[in-house]
Amino acid sequence: MLSLNQALEEMLGQLPAPSSTETLPLNQCANRILAEDIFSPIDVPSFDNSAMDGYALRFEDLEKFADFRVIGKSFAGNPFTGQIQAGECVRIMTGAMIPAGADVVIMQEQAETVADDRIRFNAQPKLGANIRRVGEDVKQGALVLAKGSKLNVASLPLLASLGIAHVSVFSRLKVAILSTGDELTSVGEPLEAGKIYDTNRFTVRLLLEKLNCEILDYDILSDDPALFEKTFSEAQAASDVLITSGGVSVGEADFTKAVLEKLGKVNFWKIAMKPGKPFAFGQLGKTWFFGLPGNPVSALVTFYQLVQPALAKLSGLNAQGIANLTSNLTACAATNLKKAVGRQDFQRGFYYLDEQGNLMVKAVGMQGSHIFSAFYESNCFIVLEAERGNVTAGEKVTIQPFNALLS
């Protein structure tokens, strides 16, 4: 069996970057992936302006004059248009253009009125103090955002500050989803004896919505090979990606692998991880296939660890963005952790700082692949290496805090 890292490397190496793009206004670009490099068309700020409410004057005059004549005011959007001469100053507001001749701003708290139009200063600022220079934030022609960057509440306002109203983004992925099994009942329907609710399709839909995918829902497939083949063919024609839940184990009614081999290609089938061993990756023509396990915890863990970076690659996110989807920290185990040697284990945990400021983590609930309730009280995965056995409280372990997908 492949390790998780081997599976990720093989999968990401096969998946192509997208080619389809569209141009959209900024207000429609949240969580989209940029399809072009963006260079600044202007300097930001585009003019020297004041960082403080205060007075603008000539730095050289501070050693020549005891007090200064106030000759006008400069407001943001309504600048002073004259020229400052020796012994003069201009009342200036934050963000206002620096008047011609001025090269320092003294904040108003360091000024004292000595007459109706005269000010004395009790400060010795440096040349250029409290002045924001042209291009100090962004210089004209500088690379602002690289192709493959995710557009969000940090990057979109930056583009707006440059006056950029439209950008080219990669088209949204069309993702088909379905669940398999005669035992499944749609959420909201009456539950018959021996049936369970289709939690996984509901969960996958939520995750795909957060990833800004276009979702094609093929509902629940009964255990019928002919129906599998028909639905897989329809999904292949309509989508970029097909994600199934269930049907990837070794039971008599698990038809997914057989149909995938008939219509397409199985790239790998099992991974040495727990939960999530029966995970499938393959192709149906131009459509990429991901087969999640039927157990709810296994399905969510494999989606998070494998499908999430795969969809990011297919959506156009750059390599650094994909690497940043997960991050690992070292914490001290606050509880004993049960672990068998052989597979990498992702246990649900809760990390926190103790009274001494140490990063601690404790296991949350039962760790079975069918125990979904533990996720609700968790904020991280406790990642235990394949060769590691039981962990005793006090030992160091690796944790992986949940990213925004699970928050």
Predicted features, each with a name:
Residues L4-N5, A165-L292, P296-T302, L306:
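Helix-rich terminal scaffold detector
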